[in-house]
Amino acid sequence: NGNPPHKQDNVFQTTREDRMEMVTRSIEKYDYFRLEDYEIKRQEISYSYQTMEYFKEKYPENHFYFIIGADSLFMFEQWVHPERIAATCTILAAYRDDKNNRQVMEDKIAELNRKYNADFRLLVTPVLPMASHELRNRLQQGGSVTGEIPIEAEEYIREHHLYQ
C-alpha cells in the first residue's frame, strides 16, 4: 500500500519510492507479477476499497485476489467499506500453521462469506521464520536477511542504507 491509513507514523522507515523499487526489483524476473503504482501516485491516504474499485474499473476482464493475514481477517469488519472490498475480489486469508488456529479462521471466513455474500478463502502458506518487523529489527542491528527476502530487495536495502 502506498499510503495506508493505519501506518501514518512512518513505521516503514522507508519512502514509498523505496518500497516500490524493492518490489519492482524483486518481481522483474516473473512474468506473472506486475507492480501497479496507483497508490504510490496518490497523495491522499489509500483505502483498500478505492484501490480494488480502481482495479476492477481499469481491468474489468480480470478476477482479483486480495491477500490478507489472519489479524486483518479478524479486523476486516472495521475496515473502511469492507462490503465494497468484498464485492470486488476473492479475499484470501493467509493461514500459518505455527501461528493461527485453523478452525477459528475457517469459522470467521464462513461468517464473513455470509455477511457480505463474498468469497473469502483460507490460504495455507509456508511457514516463514520471521515477521516483517523482525526482519527490520535484524537489519537495524546490522544482521543478515539473506535467504529471508528476495536478493534484489536485500541489495537495494544495503545500497540505500535502509532500516538503519
What are these regions (language model features)?
Residues N1-Q164:
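Nucleotidyltransferase catalytic core that binds NTPs
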